[in-house]
Amino acid sequence: MDSNILVKKEESVKVNFVSTLQGKFNNAFAALSERSFRIDGMSGKAYASPNDVKIEIENFRNYKFNATVQRVFDIFIVKLSAILPHKKLETDTEYRRFQTISITLKEYMTLCNLKNKTKAIDQLRNALNIIGRIHVDFMDTIYTNKKKVEKNFCYFQIADNIARDKGKGLYYISFNIEFLRHLANSYVMPFPLQAFRIDLNRYPIAYQLCRRLTLHHNMNYFKGNANSISVKSLIDSVSLLPTHQEILKGAGQVSLRIIKPLEKVLDFLVESGILTDWHYNQQFSKKTYEQWIDSAIVFTFVDFPKRKNYNATSNDESKKVTPNIG
């Protein structure tokens, strides 16, 4: 399809949004892929440092890091977002009330439109085993007694425990108190429910791409560029795509390995009812990589929730979108 022409969605498709949290760790974690990590041959630990967030994962080679792991993590954060008070908690005792989040196998399968029970179980097991082995280290802003302060979230494991109740079909994450403190001071972000239903085997980069577009739109909602993102920013957030330098060193065409896959996924996001349309901000007489990388993508979400312009210290819970994940 000629992507200079607006791609239109079918009017019958309906999209709902849920609330999630766009914390510094969450945003960094969402942009990773297996190729983002450096693996220590002796310890088996994997290391990555996206956006000044140091991430360490134990026994990395024993599990498979992919978009499914990020999707499972985001689903737990959506469930946490539904109950975690925003910028209101102070003590560890207060945070412990919201520490453990669970999801049923049936809920996960319904949410992600999965039919194969065995594959769904494997996805949850693999994802939770990775999430339970993540250590992080980063600086971030929190609010203490309604005052904005910089806090060093110094090397800790994000989950105190992961568990499975096989009889009840339940999967649990007990988040670390420090991680909850970070999340409770993060910004709330609407997220398209349809994104969880993306077929990650057919469209492995679609989830990362959708999340990046959502983050950009939400962060710039009250600015003039909420519906426009540079191609460079977009592909930098999709670590599964090869880089221009990698293609120049090896075989293959830039158009076939970077440009076309990106356009195909943007078309898919329209067809699946997440976006209304997308197009480039300019016409290309000849689409060279240099022209393409300097261009921008203009996009429109289907029924993105309207927001009010709260100031940074607002504690108003009404800024949350009503969660609806079953």
Feature annotation, model-predicted:
Residues 1-326:
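Charged, alpha-helix-forming regions
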